[in-house]
Regions:
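Helix-loop boundary and gating motifs at the non-cytosolic
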Residues: 5-53, 207-211, 220-229, 233, ...
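Central cavity-lining transmembrane alpha-helices of secondary-active solute carriers
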Residues: 50-63, 245-257
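Helix-to-loop junctions at the C-terminal end of transmembrane segments
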Residues: 59-71, 156, 254-270, 357
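Structural signature of the two symmetry-related core transmembrane helices
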Residues: 75-88, 273-288, 370
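Cytoplasmic helix-loop-helix junction between adjacent transmembrane helices
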Residues: 104-139
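Intracellular juxtamembrane helix-capping segments at the cytosolic ends
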Residues: 112-125, 312-326
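C-terminal membrane-cytosol helix-exit motif in multi-pass small-molecule transporters
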Residues: 167-188, 379-383
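A late C-terminal transmembrane helix in Major Facilitator Superfamily
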Residues: 329-357
């Protein structure tokens, strides 16, 4: 692909992803607030919130199949069109079953967008700029988690125009997606796709995918239960909620410098391996300090900052690594596995940590965190030393 076309493609992917995600993260809390205003139970609202993630998890293994059948450019168009259409559906109907179906479809499209955008950014970045571009992309995605809800608050969640603003952002994402230039044909059109392709990718890079799991566990999963952790420490509700911001700040600050540093190694593969080992070790050290937090509660802030930064950095380095090794449909398969392992790590952290915070906050909870961090560090260290990546 010519340099100018690659630059246009990268800019269009960044812009379309940014607008689509801002719209999505405005829309989800808006829908939940409307459901509560309609006296729909909290349990049903929670199930609705989980439906989007279910769509991501269920559809992600088939992203490579869509890319192979439609082409990567058309797959990105589809990933932008479905959320835009779904957002209009939320405007014109209040039927709860329809809302669930639309949210499932929007989640599936988000999974396709997640996989395709990251794979294309990795493949079409120049080798000396791949880490920077991936780090910048991950940082941009992280800002949408904050910007979407903040814009909703500014516009007013009870304003009738709020739905239309969500739709406008998503339509803007679709418009930018249409500006993505034609992409070269995948270098591996006969690559395995679907579940078989995902399984092969997992077998090819098991330790990289473990890094994705640990990244999801500490960046996204633990973050989701930090308010409960703060309350267990005796913090008030406001300070407990701010722990989430500390984790998000760590993630936002660290991903771009991590990507830029990964570009500077003469031996890129060895450099990435070494950085993963260091980041995993920092995560382990932070978890070992957790038992000291109860009597010294201010330690919680730097610890959760490190968890967010380390988790985001592990995911970023894993994406840079597979983007440096693979292309085409094979890269889409590997990206799909990385997304799945990251999501699985997040789900495992949320479920297990919530239980342990209730039954054993001073022993079981830190022990679980230390065990996950230790397994990740040992696996990455052994893989680096044996050059098994």
């Amino acid at each position: 692909m010519p340099v100018h076309a690659a630059r246009l493609g990268l800019f269009a992917i960044f812009a379309s992803t940014f607008l689509e995600l801002v719209g999505y993260f405005m829309l989800l809390p808006l829908l939940l607030l409307r459901m509560k205003g309609a006296d729909i139970s909290t349990s049903v609202a929670g199930l609705f919130a989980a439906t989007g993630w279910a769509g991501i998890f269920l559809f992600t293994p088939f992203a490579s199949w869509v890319a192979q059948r439609l082409g990567r450019r058309s797959a990105l168009w589809l990933a932008a069109a479905i959320p835009a259409i779904a957002s209009l559906g939320f405007v014109f109907t209040d039927a709860l079953p329809v809302w669930f179906a639309l949210e499932l479809l929007a989640g599936a499209a988000s999974g396709l967008r997640w996989v395709m955008a990251e794979a294309v950014v990795a493949e079409f970045s120049a080798p000396g700029q791949r880490g920077r571009n991936i780090g910048l992309f991950e940082t941009m995605v992280g800002t949408t988690f904050i910007l979407g809800p903040a814009l909703l608050v500014w516009l007013g969640p009870l304003e009738p125009a709020a739905f239309w603003w969500c739709t406008a952002f998503m339509v803007g994402g679709l418009a930018w997606s249409l500006l993505i230039p034609p992409l070269p044909a995948a270098a591996d059109p006969q690559a395995a796709v679907g579940v078989r392709g995902v399984w092969r990718a997992l077998l090819a890079h098991p330790v990289i995918m473990l890094a994705g799991f640990v990244g999801g566990f500490f960046e996204s999963g633990i973050t989701s239960i930090l308010p409960l952790y703060g309350l267990s420490l005796g913090l008030d509700a406001s300070r407990s909620a701010l722990l989430v911001s500390a984790s998000g700040l760590g993630s936002a600050i660290m991903m771009l410098p991590t990507g830029m540093l990964a570009d500077r190694w003469t031996d890129g593969a060895h450099g990435r391996r070494s950085m993963m080992v260091i980041v995993a070790f920092v995560t382990l050290l932070a978890t070992c300090i957790v038992p000291m937090v109860a009597p010294i509660d201010w330690l919680a802030w730097p610890i959760v900052f490190l968890w967010g930064g380390a988790g985001g950095s592990l995911y970023t380095l894993a994406m840079i690594d597979i983007g440096s090794r693979e292309q085409g449909i094979t890269l889409v398969n590997s990206t799909a596995v990385l997304v799945l392992t990251y999501t699985l790590g997040s789900m495992c952290a949320s479920a297990s940590s919530g239980v342990l915070l209730q039954w054993s906050p001073t022993f079981g909870f830190p022990l679980l965190l230390a065990a996950v961090a230790l397994v990740g560090w040992i696996a990455l260290l052994r893989a680096r030393n044996a050059a098994l990546f």
